[in-house]
Amino acid sequence: MPRPTKFRRVEFFPENNYFVPWGKPKCEIHEVVLKVEELEAMRLKDIEELNQEQCAEKMEISRQTFQNIIDSARKKVAIALTEGNAIKISGGHYTTKLCKLKCIDCEEIYEINYEQDRHLCPNCGSEKVICNKKADFCRRWCKGQNRKEQYEESKNK
């Protein structure tokens, strides 16, 4: 069974996500879909001028995965430009932020993205999870989730 795809960390979203060639009739335009993480890879490498290792580190993926993503992105952009296709930026397997959580019951450490509300431990199903970063609670994920109260109740029992 293949490993699950890791979320790619993305820091930038474009204001415009659709680009079409000027003067070409709409009925003749074909569309190339550029994933959000592919655009992020090109931004880091070509605009920020980071090396491959720095880019991979920022996106929280391996160097090989980064290379595969940027190769795919550059190929899509080159095809769109040479064939006069539209470029649509959408989709992909990305997140704006990852959070490491720790289960108090089984001590499993796992990652979630903020777009995914995972308040149950994937290992034991417990709801007693805390943010593993500095043994504190993740402000963005745990805020309003009553996680801190649950944890303190479990400590007092």
UniProtKB/Swiss-Prot annotation:
- Name the chain's protein: UPF0251 protein CLD_3165
Which InterPro entries does the protein's record reference?
RNA_pol_sigma_r3/r4-like, UPF0251
Q: Which organism is it from?
A: Clostridium botulinum (strain Okra / Type B1)
| One Pfam family in the UniProt entry | DUF134
Q: Which family does it belong to?
A: Belongs to the UPF0251 family.
Please indicate which superkingdom the organism of origin belongs to.
Bacteria
